[in-house]
């Protein structure tokens, strides 16, 4: 039988060898694969790239570890290690390591970094990497850095050139198994919770969705675990990397942004997140002037009838009010004049309704809704990040919530109910109004992608045994109900007037047990229904059953669990603060300061 050297010469003469570049030194070599039926494994014969006599003859066997083979024949320099960075063991990324240090011994085999091929220091974040790639991955995930590739997104990442393209380096880290949950666990200790699951939108986590449609990566999700939520109703692990392409999102040339620059580009986004997050930490940090005022107030307690509990309540209410005043001012000013004019115009024509049901209501002349109530414009935070994170989703949802509150406040009849009744109505039906807003802003918010993210999060959490089957079933049912409702509304091609009347009918629902003046609220609902019927008859005279089809969609709103909606869309932004607790402060804002209608996409 011919020797290995003879087989090598025969193959080289037939020009069947492959010339590759060794990434460590940049030297071109020729690798030839010879088959010997009497020997198990693959045999690699490395020759000079000019086809001369082979400089090295190496017999290699494939190891059980994917993408790695070990040498069985050392050369004069010591033990070599042949390592392929592609799972199919192709020779496109060939790396050789020779160690001839006297203290290592001839049988010492070193692991290489799966990302760049440098000498690995151990397993970091789920993959064998060097210290350099470990630190790079940790910084990228913790700071949520966004990178761009100036090439074709297949840059060579090796020991010498790994810093040239941070985008490809990060993609390579993720592709070879580095997980973000390991990074998150280092940020704070894992808390022991009564349930094994955690929240789907924790404030320290990030939901990543690939935005670049040209990326060669396949849509394989990698789940990222979060620390257990302190709320007992925590639902899902949220931080995850999703290769889901948002439909309808324009692919833009990405810009390399550091964390500081990214925050400056998303000014109102970070401001909103910081202000709302501060509500979860009320009383923890105070400025010096505020401390002095508090001390004087505390001293006065000894000479006053005010109790300490009452003082703490006043202190908390003041913090919440100031935080939400700042939150409202962080949003760009828009069309607040419409709301002011509507409220001013109702004076003299509508009597304020208090909690006393004996007070008669004088019905306002004219329609319940005017043309100014039809416009419902939602502008998403700009710019849209390359990787959609939970704070971006949270602020988008909070803008929709603010916009819905602004819409309700602009209705004179709603204002006529008085502050307490108005707050009770919004507390009771904010989830229904928010869900209708999701359907109306389906394309602007790219709701389909957000829901797909939640579904993949559930699948991965179940596979990793992070929640029970019953809990997963509950969440999946809610998400599918939400998706089904929005899809059905989109198919009906509902216009702005129809959405306005549907929301008015939902808002003035008198069947909640905590409401007062139910008869007055019912009159508003009846008036909204009559106006809705007149509009449908005039606008769609040939569609006899359109009104019935639209009204029959409203019962599905009652099936939406407000707690789960809150967990999915708002928990990552406001922590343990409940939507019910912030609604009064939103509705008590001054009209000049309150405005979440930012000029932008018109629905």
Curated annotation (Swiss-Prot):
SUBUNIT field? Homodimer. Heterodimer; binds DNA as a heterodimer with NR2C2 required for chromatin remodeling and for binding to promoter regions such as globin DR1 repeats. Interacts with NRIP1 (via its LXXLL motifs); the interaction provides corepressor activity. Interacts with HDAC3 (via the DNA-binding domain). Interacts with HDAC4 (via the DNA-binding domain). Interacts with PIAS1; the interaction is required for sumoylation of NR2C1. Interacts with UBE2I; the interaction is required for sumoylation of NR2C1. Interacts with KAT2B; the interaction acts as a corepressor of gene expression.
Location of this chain's protein in the cell:
Nucleus; Nucleus, PML body
- Tell me the residues on which Phosphothreonine occurs: 220, 222
Q: In what way is this protein post-translationally modified? A: Sumoylation requires both PIAS1 and UBE2I. Sumoylation appears to dissociate NR2C1 from the PML nuclear bodies. Enhances the interaction with NRIP1 but inhibits interaction with KAT2B. In proliferating cells, stimulation by all-trans retinoic acid, activation of MAPK1-mediated phosphorylation and recruitment to PML bodies with subsequent sumoylation, suppresses OCT4 expression.
Q: Which UniProt keywords apply?
A: Activator, DNA-binding, Isopeptide bond, Metal-binding, Nucleus, Phosphoprotein, Receptor, Repressor, Transcription, Transcription regulation, Ubl conjugation, Zinc, Zinc-finger
Q: Check the record and name the InterPro entries matching this protein.
A: NHR-like_dom_sf (IPR035500), NR2C1/2-like_DBD (IPR048245), NR2C1/2-like_LBD (IPR048246), Nucl_hrmn_rcpt_lig-bd (IPR000536), Nuclear_hormone_rcpt_NR2 (IPR050274), Nuclear_hrmn_rcpt (IPR001723), Znf_hrmn_rcpt (IPR001628), Znf_NHR/GATA (IPR013088)
Query: Which residue ranges does the Swiss-Prot or TrEMBL entry mark as DNA-binding?
Result: 110-185
Which species does this protein come from?
Homo sapiens (Human)
Q: What is its main location?
A: nucleus
Zn finger intervals (NR C4-type): 113-133, 149-173
Extract one GO BP annotation from the record. Answer: positive regulation of retinoic acid receptor signaling pathway
Question: Disulfide connectivity?
Answer: none
Query: Which Pfam families does UniProt cross-reference here?
Result: Hormone_recep, zf-C4
The family classification in the record reads: Belongs to the nuclear hormone receptor family. NR2 subfamily.
User: Could you name the Gene Ontology cellular component terms for this entry?
Assistant: chromatin; nucleoplasm; PML body
Spell out the residue ranges making up region: Required for interaction with KAT2B.
Answer: 1-178
Q: What is the lineage of its organism?
A: Eukaryota, Metazoa, Chordata, Craniata, Vertebrata
Annotated region (Required for interaction with NRIP1), positions in chain: 584-603
Show the PANTHER family listed in the entry.
NUCLEAR HORMONE RECEPTOR
Modification Phosphoserine, positions:
197, 215, 581
Domain named NR LBD is located at 348-590
Q: Which domain of life is it from?
A: Eukaryota
Glycyl lysine isopeptide (Lys-Gly) (interchain with G-Cter in SUMO2) cross-link position in this chain? 250, 588
Protein name (Swiss-Prot/TrEMBL): Nuclear receptor subfamily 2 group C member 1
Q: What does this protein do?
A: Orphan nuclear receptor. Binds the IR7 element in the promoter of its own gene in an autoregulatory negative feedback mechanism. Primarily repressor of a broad range of genes. Binds to hormone response elements (HREs) consisting of two 5'-AGGTCA-3' half site direct repeat consensus sequences. Together with NR2C2, forms the core of the DRED (direct repeat erythroid-definitive) complex that represses embryonic and fetal globin transcription. Also activator of OCT4 gene expression. May be involved in stem cell proliferation and differentiation.
Supply the CDD domains for this chain.
NR_DBD_TR2_like, NR_LBD_TR2_like
């Amino acid at each position: 039988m011919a020797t290995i050297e003879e087989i090598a010469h025969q193959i080289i003469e037939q020009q069947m060898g492959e010339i590759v570049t060794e990434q460590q030194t940049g030297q071109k070599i020729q690798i030839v694969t010879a088959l010997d039926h009497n020997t198990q494994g693959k045999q690699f014969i490395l020759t000079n790239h000019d086809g001369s006599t082979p400089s090295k003859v190496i017999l290699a066997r494939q190891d059980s570890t994917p993408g790695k083979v070990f040498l069985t024949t050392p050369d004069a320099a010591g033990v070599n290690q042949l390592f392929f960075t592609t799972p199919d063991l192709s020779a496109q990324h060939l790396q050789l390591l020779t160690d001839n240090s006297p203290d290592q011994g001839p049988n010492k085999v070193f692991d290489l970094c799966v990302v760049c091929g440098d000498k690995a220091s151990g397993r970091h974040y789920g993959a064998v990497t060097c210290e350099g790639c470990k630190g790079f991955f940790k910084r990228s995930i913790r700071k949520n850095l966004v990178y761009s590739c100036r090439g074709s997104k297949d840059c060579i990442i090796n020991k010498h050139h790994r810093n040239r393209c941070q985008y490809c380096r990060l993609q390579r880290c993720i592709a070879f198994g580095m997980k973000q949950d390991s990074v998150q666990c280092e940020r704070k200790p894992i808390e022991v919770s009564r349930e094994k699951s955690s929240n789907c939108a924790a404030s320290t986590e990030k939901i990543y969705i690939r935005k670049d449609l040209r990326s060669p990566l396949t849509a394989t999700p990698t789940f990222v675990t979060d620390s257990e939520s302190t709320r007992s109703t925590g639902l899902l692990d949220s931080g995850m990397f999703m290769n889901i392409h948002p439909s309808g999102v324009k692919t833009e040339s990405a810009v390399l942004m550091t964390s500081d620059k990214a925050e400056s580009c998303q000014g109102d986004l970070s401001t909103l997140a910081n202000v709302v997050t501060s509500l979860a930490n009320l009383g923890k940090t105070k400025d010096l002037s505020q401390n002095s005022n508090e001390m004087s107030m505390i001293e006065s307690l000894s000479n006053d009838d005010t109790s300490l509990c009452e003082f703490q309540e006043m202190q908390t209410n003041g913090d919440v009010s100031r935080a939400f005043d700042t939150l409202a001012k962080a949003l760009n000013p828009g069309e607040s004049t419409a709301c002011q004019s509507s409220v001013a115009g109702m004076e003299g024509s509508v009597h304020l309704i208090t909690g006393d049901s004996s007070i008669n209501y004088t019905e306002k002349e004219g329609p319940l809704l005017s043309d100014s109530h039809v416009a419902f414009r939602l502008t998403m935070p700009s710019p849209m990040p390359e990787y959609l994170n939970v704070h971006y989703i949270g602020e988008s949802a909070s803008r929709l919530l603010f916009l819905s509150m602004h819409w309700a406040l602009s209705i004179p009849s709603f204002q006529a109910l008085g502050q307490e009744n108005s707050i009770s109505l919004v507390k009771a039906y904010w989830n229904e109004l928010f869900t209708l807003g999701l359907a109306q802003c389906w394309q602007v918010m790219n709701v389909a992608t957000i829901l797909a993210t939640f579904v993949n999060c559930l699948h991965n959490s179940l596979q990793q045994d992070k929640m029970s089957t019953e809990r997963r079933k509950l969440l999946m049912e809610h998400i599918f109900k939400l998706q089904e409702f929005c899809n059905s509304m989109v198919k009906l091609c509902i216009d702005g007037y129809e959405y306005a009347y549907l929301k008015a009918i939902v808002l003035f629902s008198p069947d909640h047990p905590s409401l007062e003046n139910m008869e007055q609220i019912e009159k508003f609902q009846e008036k909204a229904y009559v106006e809705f019927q007149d509009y449908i008859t005039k606008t769609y005279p040939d569609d006899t059953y359109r009104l019935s089809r639209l009204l029959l969609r409203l019962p599905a709103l009652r099936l939406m669990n407000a707690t789960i909606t809150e967990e999915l869309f708002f928990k990552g932004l406001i922590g343990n603060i409940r939507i019910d607790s912030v609604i009064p402060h939103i509705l008590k804002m001054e009209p000049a300061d309150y405005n979440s209608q930012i000029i932008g996409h018109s629905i």
